[in-house]
């Protein structure tokens, strides 16, 4: 019996050492590629809107940027251990509207978010469809105020993704400063390759975009922690198994 305990102890120690080495390997500091540096700087600089066809890899790009930055953030879906999941109705400037700003009737409110913690909104076109612009204006008049003043209020940015640029609520679209199109995702086993194009507006009065860069982004599979079929669990009374979730991530479908 003593020999069995010794063997089990040795196996346990070996397992702990192996897991520790793997964690250190996965989270080791690596030199950022040009594409990664551009992404980190762009998301730190301004509000970014990511768009692309269904399954192109929009959430994969969000998850990769979040992993690169390694900072606390807020989102409507859990991308990583650093995500604080929020309801999107929490994105507001209290009960203050543009009318209150004009009339000087500002009502102070308690801070909801921490300083310098960005917000990532997945599938903005589902939550804020442009077909409901008028209703959204009436129901959430304070959200656009937050979007316009987020740098003043919390020194943060608000990033969104959607399938088509024109699909989200106009009040959200007009606050974007940078646009990234995800063309496709290719599976390479232990990593995914995302083809992206960066754009900016030609001028503030035009919705036409001009291309500024093109990159292929390498995304290690191990850094993807989110459920690529999140809305299945939101809407359907069933849940993917851990194996099915990992299979979806490795396939690069998001």
Functional labels for PLM-detected ranges:
Residues 67-75:
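Post-Walker A helix-loop "phosphate-sensing" segment adjacent to the P-loop in P-loop NTPases
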Residues 1-10:
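Feature marks short, highly hydrophobic, charge-poor N-terminal signal-anchor/signal peptide-like helices
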């Amino acid at each position: 019996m003593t020999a069995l305990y010794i063997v089990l102890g040795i196996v346990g120690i070996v397992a702990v050492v192996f897991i520790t080495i793997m964690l250190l390997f996965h989270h080791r500091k690596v030199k950022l590629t040009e594409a990664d540096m551009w992404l980190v700087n762009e998301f730190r600089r301004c509000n970014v809107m990511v768009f692309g066809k269904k399954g192109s890899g929009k959430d994969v790009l969000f998850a990769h940027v979040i992993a690169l930055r390694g900072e606390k953030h807020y989102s409507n879906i859990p991308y990583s251990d650093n995500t604080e999941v929020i309801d999107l109705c929490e994105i507001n400037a209290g009960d203050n509207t543009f009318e209150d700003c004009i009339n000087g009737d500002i009502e102070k409110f308690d801070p909801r978010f921490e300083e310098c913690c960005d917000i990532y909104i997945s599938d903005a076109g589902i939550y804020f469809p442009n077909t409901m612009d008028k209703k959204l204006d009436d129901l959430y008049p304070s959200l656009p105020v937050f979007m316009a003043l987020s740098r003043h209020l919390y020194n943060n940015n608000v990033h969104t993704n959607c399938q088509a640029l024109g699909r989200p609520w106009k009040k959200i679209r007009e606050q974007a400063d940078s646009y990234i199109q995800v063309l496709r995702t290719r599976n390479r086993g232990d990593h995914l390759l995302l083809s992206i194009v960066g754009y900016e507006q030609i001028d503030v009065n035009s919705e036409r975009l001009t291309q500024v860069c093109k990159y292929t982004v390498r995304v290690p599979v191990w850094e993807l922690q989110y459920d690529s079929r999140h809305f299945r669990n939101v809407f359907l009374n069933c849940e993917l198994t851990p194996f099915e979730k990992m299979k979806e991530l490795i396939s690069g479908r998001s």
